[in-house]
A protein has these predicted regions:
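Short, flexible, mixed-charge acidic loops at enzyme active sites
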Residues: 26-34
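Active-site-proximal cofactor/substrate-binding loop regions of enzyme domains
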Residues: 1-19
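Active-site-proximal beta-strand/loop segments in catalytic clefts of secreted hydrolases
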Residues: 18-21, 54
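Conserved catalytic region of serine esterases and O-acyltransferases that act on ester linkages
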Residues: 37-201
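Generic secondary-structure signature for well-ordered alpha-helical cores
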Residues: 5, 9-10, 27, 59-67
């Protein structure tokens, strides 16, 4: 790996080391479970969770860690938007029992796959236990401060999404974890089309 990295630097090529971090994850996890592996049945190529780990390492090497899908922060008491990263937030309206706004995202959340393929032992979702993908690359944050104690319903496009406490909303929720949002469903359709294309190749 060091040799390849040196050649890449000499030739001004991009370089990503998949081997060392993936071996390190395997060794760490095997300390608790000797059968753990990010590899597939052939013990060489990555399994479904291993592919997500590789994607994470590749994207991180491109400097994409820490860039949110979106990050919305609203001061409910002050009736103002304090942050709108990678999105547009407009039409904020705050009343005694309601807070509404228009949210236009510039990207979609990544829909984590929980399906098993080709008799694999792991799913893509299993990778989330060994990499901080959701925090670093799949964060669609919504934070609302200044709310009175109690429970609040979140609706998007007229659809009920979930119920959260004022404390949870102040701390911030990751909407990419909510599989019933319109944006998650849209991302699922794109993933399905991509899988159909992949099966035809």
């Amino acid at each position: 790996v060091d040799f390849l990295n040196a050649r890449a630097r000499e030739n001004q090529w991009g370089f990503v080391d998949f081997n060392r971090p993936m071996v390190a994850i395997n060794q760490w996890e095997q300390a608790a479970d000797s059968m753990y592996t990010l590899c597939g049945k052939d013990r060489i190529h990555p399994s479904t969770d291993g592919h997500l780990v590789m994607a994470y390492l590749f994207l991180k090497a491109q400097g994409l860690a820490g860039k949110p899908v979106a990050d919305i922060r609203i001061d409910g008491a002050g009736k103002k938007v304090t942050r709108s990263d990678n999105c547009r937030v407009s039409d904020l309206s705050v009343s005694s029992d309601n807070l509404t706004f228009t949210y236009e995202a510039k990207s979609l959340p990544y829909p984590i796959d929980t399906s098993y393929y080709d008799n694999e032992k792991h799913t893509q979702a299993d990778a989330l236990s060994v990499i901080p993908f959701m925090d670093e690359m799949n964060y669609e944050g919504l934070s609302v401060s200044g709310l009175s104690d109690g429970y609040y319903g979140l609706t998007i496009g007229g659809e009920f999404i979930g119920r959260f406490t004022a404390r949870e909303l102040e701390r911030g929720i990751n909407m990419a974890l909510l599989q019933n949002t319109p944006q998650y469903k849209q991302a699922m359709k794109i993933r399905q089309m991509n899988e159909e294309r992949w099966l035809k190749e």
